[in-house]
Amino acid sequence: MPLPGFTKSDFETFLIDGLEERMAAIRSNIQPKFQVIGAELRDELSTLLGNEMFLHIAQHARRTTNPPNDTWLAVAGNKRGYKKHPHFQVGLFDDHLFIWLAFIYELPEKGNIAKTFLENKPLIEEVVPSDYVVSIDHTKKEANPLSELDLTQSLERFRDVKKAEWLVGRHFAKGSETVENGEQLMEAIRQTVKTLLPLYQLSLTAGAPTR
């Protein structure tokens, strides 16, 4: 399968009513594309890092009533799961595609990672372009450009609030050429991940488990 992009019909998946119906569309339309894109990303990250990385595709298994408003793939250094580990995500809401370096609330070392990031704030500001965005909740669409964000406040919240999260990356609007053209999309993913790789590696020095 050639590198796929995501079309209008893929985004319309999130307009389908009913958990089973929406999940059926996610499995048939979106997850095969995630498999191809994710395998490419997994292999490239394994080469860049010199460690085996693993692809995970969100199954939304905990849901019993409400259908998911977004779906994603994740690449992490752990074979069994990704939520307790720093990881990269590529996924869709109904109006945009996101590429994240994600630190979500299940991460046991999030306090140490936040502390390390606060101590290395100048590095973050140097490495991450100002038009990249930060989210403090992976379940919400909202994200703020780094240039408009109080970085210290967001990292202190990540450190101090049990359910707080910190994700950094890029958004691309549905219908954009980058999203619909598979080669362009993969190049955008590569560029984003390479840009954020120093932060991923820094998080590992804070005691985050990789296996």
From Swiss-Prot:
InterPro entries with a match to the protein in the record: UPF0637, UPF0637_domain_sf
Chain ranges passing through the membrane: none
UniProt family annotation: Belongs to the UPF0637 family.
Family matches, as HAMAP family: UPF0637
Name used for this protein in its record: UPF0637 protein ABC2405
Organism listed in the record: Shouchella clausii (strain KSM-K16) (Alkalihalobacillus clausii)
Lineage: Bacteria, Bacillati, Bacillota, Bacilli, Bacillales
